[in-house]
């Protein structure tokens, strides 16, 4: 084989091998990227005073993550949530409360005033975090992740407020049910002890139905 042909073949083999390694590395990086943000433990949020809190602090606990509001028709759910918290907290259950002002501007006021309102009116003891946005480009990354994991769960049409929400949202967007975004205050996400999102409940869901699933995850 002529020397020039030999070197050309060798160079071509090196080029092909290098390309192969590049593709392997790309596939590996893509695979690793897809595995990122698999659980809520990958996220850091801010408490009501602005301090960073890693959700790894809640590893091995069953969590209920809720976007809340203080001037909403569902605000009395704070009372039910507190009872749920008191009943199961010692068994490893935690409620993470994220006030949100995106729905009818029903969570006005500062983080501290919201906290004081909930303590005074409902005696809440579960953790409350800094007010967040849950939809849109500026949505908190945690809530973007939660939506990706569990889409709209549907209204309980037996609830008195459900027909009003259905009418309002369907007029705004006839296809709203097909989208995973948060529809209203007091949407709840249930997290297992591995940090995985296992269920989503809309604001109209009965708390006793949620409680049954919490009990199952605590076993």
Which sequence ranges carry the predicted segments?
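Non-catalytic, surface beta->alpha helical segment in thiol-disulfide oxidoreductase systems
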Residues: 199-218
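Thiol-based oxidoreductase modules, predominantly thioredoxin-like and allied folds used
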Residues: 92-109, 125-136
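Basic polycationic patches enriched in arginine
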Residues: 3-4, 15
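N-terminal "domain-start" segment that seeds a small globular fold
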Residues: 33-56
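Conserved helix-turn-beta segment immediately C-terminal to the redox Cys motif
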Residues: 61-63, 70-71, 75-99, 118-122
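Thiol/selenol-based redox catalytic cores and closely related redox-interacting motifs
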Residues: 117-119, 123-205
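Short hydrophobic alpha-helical segments enriched in small aliphatic residues
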Residues: 12-14, 18, 25-27
